[in-house]
Amino acid sequence: AGSAFQSLGRIGFVLRNRGYLVLLVIFSLMVMPVMSFLSTSSFIYMNLFNLSAEKYSYFFAFNGCFAMLAPILYMRVLRKLPRLLFLTVCFGCVAVSGSLILIFGAANPFVFALLYVPVTFFGSACRPAGTMLIMNQMDTDNGTVGSLWGCVALLFGSLSMMLCSLNWPVLTMAVGTISLCAGTSCVIIWLVAVSRKMFK
């Protein structure tokens, strides 16, 4: 029992770090657009666009290629950009892509796939920088820091999937709305946090 209470105490200690808490919220929000796509993509491609399972798998693989490409490009090229500019662009592009999906996403499968690419690419590209920022906020309790981020990100992702289960007129609207709201929220919180120097 003592060990459990001590663990909870360490979680409370970590969450009292304002910089960590702000970054935790920002980068957990970025999980939501990805999880909204994962939970709805089969319904969008197969039910809305009437594609076969095989054709759906091609579109899904196309999207997955950008998820793999983004971290590679970050390590080789994108990390040389100023962090403030890079992350602001990432969050902003997710928001813009979300708004375009909201308006044009239901047109056809190719339009939806292309409009979702920035969400996948920039959502994945910002993750290495986010991991570094989050881990740098604490000199101790690295296990708690990493575990808490994984847990909160999972909760945000679950919330996204739950929101997608609501009665949307078209499921592309769910993906677009969540991407727009998450990206916009990240831009606002990020710029406020930077201006107030909330983190290291």
Task: Name each model-derived stretch.
Residues 84-130:
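C-terminal transmembrane helical hairpin of 12-TM major facilitator-type secondary transporters
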